[in-house]
UniProtKB/Swiss-Prot annotation:
It comes from Klebsiella aerogenes. The gene is ureD. The keyword Cytoplasm applies. InterPro entries: UreD. Belongs to the UreD family. Signal peptide: none annotated. GO terms for molecular function: nickel cation binding. It is found in: Cytoplasm. Its main location: cytoplasm. Necessary for the functional incorporation of the urease nickel metallocenter. One of its GO terms (cellular component) is cytoplasm. The keyword rRNA-binding does not apply. This is Urease accessory protein UreD.
Length: 270
């Protein structure tokens, strides 16, 4: 007897990056369901800029999306998305998103997705895991929006579980979990915007510079450095300030981490 069919999209995307001809190339992109990518861009010659696409435009209960990327030694890839990920109200089923990013020695990943918006009544579970080597380099952010504060809508009900992990040489540097349920937002000071930014490897000098850049967020932002992993966390009720500060921090860190000047992805300018 066949197992019952699952409701919702069951989608996977597996990306493999290699070095060829002095630049990073997308060697393969295997996908099932509505997850795909645009043709890579090369605004910096050897660095690969890639946009993830989810044509349905939103994620609902019962959807299961799995994204994985593997960067071979020496690769440098910047991955972003053309728009926010929207998690819509669920009648009970859970939406599940798994993201696993694996970096070989000397590989560099800039993981810069747009924000994820959780509508009231959404039921979502997200797992994002970065597997690094000691000589890998990572710049990544994770920006969550609870409800639609621009129109006065709050995350008054629903469930969100967001797990973020960073491993270096098979040792955990960061294992962080946020769980919100039924409008109880006291753990995030009732703020609708929750952000995390990660940089590896980092130094005390970078930590000081990042703290200066966080000033517009006031008391609801902080940065720490543990085992060369710089972690920025912040809360806010203003999306424009959030996005500006995250980009400012990225623009400050990028030259130090990669030796390259900041080059904004084209899609951010449209």
């Amino acid at each position: 007897m066949l197992p019952p069919l699952k409701k919702g999209w069951q989608a996977t995307l597996d990306l493999r990056f290699h070095q060829a001809g002095g630049k990073t190339v997308l060697a393969s992109a295997q996908h099932v369901g509505p997850l795909t990518v645009q043709r890579p861009f090369y605004p910096e010659e050897e660095t690969c800029h890639l946009y993830l696409l989810h044509p349905p435009g939103g994620i609902v209960g019962g959807d299961e999306l799995t994204i994985s990327a593997h960067l071979a030694p020496g690769c440098h890839t910047l991955i972003t998305m053309p728009g926010a990920s929207k998690f819509y109200r669920s009648s009970g089923a859970q939406a599940l998103v798994r993201q696993q990013l694996t970096l070989a020695p000397q590989a560099t990943l800039e993981w810069l997705p747009q924000d994820a918006i959780f509508f009231p009544g959404a039921n979502a579970r997200l797992f994002t895991t970065f597997h690094l080597c000691a000589s890998s380099r990572l710049l990544a952010w994770d920006l969550l929006c609870l409800g639609r504060p621009v129109i006065g809508e709050t995350f008054s009900h629903g469930t969100l579980s967001n797990r973020l992990e960073v491993w270096v040489d098979n040792e955990p540097l960061l294992v962080e979990r946020l769980h919100l349920q039924e409008g109880e937002l006291s753990s995030i000071a009732e703020r609708p915007w929750v952000g995390t930014l990660l940089c590896y490897p980092a130094t005390d000098a970078l930590l000081d510079g990042v703290r200066d850049a966080l000033a517009p967020l006031g008391l609801y932002a902080g940065a720490s450095l543990t085992d060369r992993l710089l972690t920025v966390r912040f809360l806010s009720d203003d999306n424009l300030i959030c996005q500006r500060v995250m980009r400012d921090v990225w623009q400050f860190l990028r030259p130090h981490l990669t030796g390259k000047s900041p080059v904004l992805p084209r899609i951010w300018l449209t």
